């Protein structure tokens, strides 16, 4: 229920950690790059996540420390109004301050296939349908400003802690 309503604080309290989505970075349409907002894209093959919307996030797996970002989790109503995405849910994450090695890796295509984990910290709003690319760009800029403002008032020590790869429990761990 907390995830469905976007109460990420309650969801984190119930889970004992922020709600996390992980997967392999996949190729997108490269439109984010053209608009000035490079993204790391994760697709959902079979299931739809419990939460959708625009979120303040932290990204793990790009370096030693987590990186702040803003992410869209949903079906992209402004870009896929005619359902060219087949109704599939995407997680498109824009890091607010790309580390230079990762910016270079994205340009060179080295990020594709890399496994990342994205923690959803705070929901900014539901998905919105914008009238054209200029309105979409303005909306993304505002989301980035709102994410920075949220992060400035909600200090999170996870950005300073080294990233550790979490492992799935094995059968022996559950016995």
Where are these regions (language model features)?
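Anionic-ligand-binding alpha/beta catalytic cores of soluble enzymes and soluble regulatory domains
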Residues: 1-40
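Phosphate/ribose-recognition catalytic cores of enzymes acting on nucleotide-derived substrates
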Residues: 28-175
């Amino acid at each position: 229920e907390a995830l469905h309503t976007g109460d990420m604080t309650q969801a984190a309290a119930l889970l004992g950690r922020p709600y996390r989505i992980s997967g392999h970075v996949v190729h997108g349409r490269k439109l984010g790059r053209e608009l000035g907002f490079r993204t790391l894209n994760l697709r959902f093959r079979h299931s739809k996540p419990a939460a959708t919307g625009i979120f303040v996030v932290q990204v793990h797996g790009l370096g030693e420390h987590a990186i702040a970002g803003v992410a869209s989790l949903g079906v992209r109503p402004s870009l896929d109004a005619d359902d060219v995405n087949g109704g599939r849910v995407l997680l498109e994450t824009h890091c607010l301050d790309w580390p230079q090695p990762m910016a270079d890796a994205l340009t060179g295509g080295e990020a594709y296939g890399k496994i990342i984990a994205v923690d959803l910290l705070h929901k900014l709003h539901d998905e919105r349908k914008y009238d054209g690319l200029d309105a979409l760009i303005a909306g993304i800029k505002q989301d980035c400003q709102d994410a920075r403002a949220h992060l400035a008032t909600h200090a999170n020590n996870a950005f300073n802690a080294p990233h550790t790869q979490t492992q799935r429990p094995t059968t022996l761990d559950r016995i």
